Amino acid sequence: MIAVPEIRIMDTTLRDGMHAMAHQFTPEQMAQVAAALDEAGVDVIEVTHGDGLAGSSFQYGFAAATDEEYLEAVAPVLKKAKLAALILPGIGTCRDMRMAVQAGVKVFRIATHVTEADISEEHMGLAKEMGAEVVGFLMMSHTVGKEKIAEQAKLMESYGADVVYMVDSAGAMIPPEVTEKIGYLKEVLNIPVGFHAHNNLGLAVGNTLAAVAAGATAVDGTLRGLGAGAGNTSTEVLVAALKKAGYQVGVDLYKIMDAATVLEPMMRRPQVIDNASIILGYAGVYSSFLLHTYRAAERFGLDPRDILMELGRRKVVGGQEDYIVDVAYEMSRNKSRAV
């Protein structure tokens, strides 16, 4: 009999979900949600600004509290789950990582663009030095082929990553692509493979199931799918689907549904797949760009879909949110000249 692998659930409601909240969760709200996630048996709970440690800024949006305040609010309520923090080299620093460890972080998820794994070496080295688990996060993985993803994942493995995630930042992938790329990573890596999905094409749960079938053993979700654009993989739906498919999941289905109920009154809007979200997935644009694009479209009198398609053509990457205004301004001027 073939052993069914146990799937590790990492919930990022309190980090990736921050994008849909304009980064305005309070520390008290985070503690409430984290306690419910912990009670449900979630393995890892990620907490920071949506753009990771030190992301609170004019460029990315100011959070309601500091990373330290958020982490210190959540750490005491966790009885079983590990506390995680995201860091993007170039935004967060080694000093921020030291603060996070003092605040109770046990897992660092270190994210780079899929072609820039080399900039994670210092941060991964420090995380290992401090005794933390290291998760490599290769963002915008839809933009390159499986060989390039594998090359970059091997770099992260060499830096000490304990697991490497393929990240569909734009919700642009379809199941056959996920199957091919995850399967290839599984072949070439000597460490576990993970997958993080977005729901812009309505495929987050389906893509995650495809990833697991291809060998991924660590997967992400957010309660109610909370996140930028059409959101993320819904943790509670994913748990139900994985259990129905026969995988071992250490999360209690009823309790994770209860956790989603705790979150729901805090949400600013339901997670729906609207037209702009579809364009995000179709154009392959990073999901956190959506709210910034709406603002730029209103400011310059443009259709946000046109801005998103242009950003996709220019292959923008995470961290270039300030570029949206430049693109919108240029498009507005070109539109004026054409009149």
Curated annotation (Swiss-Prot):
Residues 7-257 form the Pyruvate carboxyltransferase domain. The active site is at residue 19. Disulfide bonds: none annotated. Substrate binds at residues 15-16, 169, 196, 286. Gene3D superfamilies: 1.10.8.60, Aldolase class I. It is an enzyme of class 4 (lyase). Keywords: Aromatic hydrocarbons catabolism, Lyase, Manganese, Metal-binding. Mn(2+) binds at residues 16, 196, 198. It catalyses: (S)-4-hydroxy-2-oxopentanoate = acetaldehyde + pyruvate. One of its GO terms (molecular function) is 4-hydroxy-2-oxovalerate aldolase activity. Pfam families: DmpG_comm, HMGL-like. Its EC number is 4.1.3.39. Belongs to the 4-hydroxy-2-oxovalerate aldolase family. This is 4-hydroxy-2-oxovalerate aldolase. It comes from Pelotomaculum thermopropionicum (strain DSM 13744 / JCM 10971 / SI).
